[in-house]
Amino acid sequence: MDCHKEKLNEFQKKYVHSPMSKRECEACHLRHGKIAVLSLREREERRLCYTCHSQMGLNMDKMANVHTALKQGMCVPCHNPHASENKSLLKKTGSEQCFTCHKQATFMRAKRHKPLADGCLTCHSAHGSPYKDNLRKQEVELCQSCHNFTANNFRKAHKDYPVQKGKCTGCHTPHSSTNDKLLRESVHAPLNLGQCASCHKPVTDPNALGVIALDGKLCYTCHKK
């Protein structure tokens, strides 16, 4: 630290990385240099971190989906390697850390999913997951953590929609939308042409949607098999 006095302020922060708090700089750096100007002991950053965080390394090597930065071998896009005011040595707090890479505008439209306000980690794993998009559970199972699919209001709202055959994100965006119920932005061609009757019968039909045919049969009248 005699030369790197600019790092002394790091010791005043709330959370200090264990090797640094013990002044064990050589746990990560080589005294005389080896790789680039950082003189790191490992060429790939995450492998260096795994020398101490070994269980994390074992877990990530088995994961089907790994956070992009970590997959590219980097930990410092999210974590400060020396010290931070934030838990887990994060550079920013909560979702603000995620918005460093993920464009915030996509998440800030008028209608917002409640878990978004609670934080991205409500639905996503920070490092990796067996599931697509680093979700904590399979998509439908994850949605059921908050939404009771057997409740009367849910069943009524989805009556005659083939929800059992698809995923929630087929119709809803998981983050934010300009539409009520977080419905996706999509204008079906017949609707765009004002041809509602090409799919729907008069409103007196007992079927809630009043569609000409159920399930995929209706779609195949235009979209050939």
Go through each PLM region and give its residues.
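Short sequence/structural segments immediately N-terminal
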Residues: 1-225
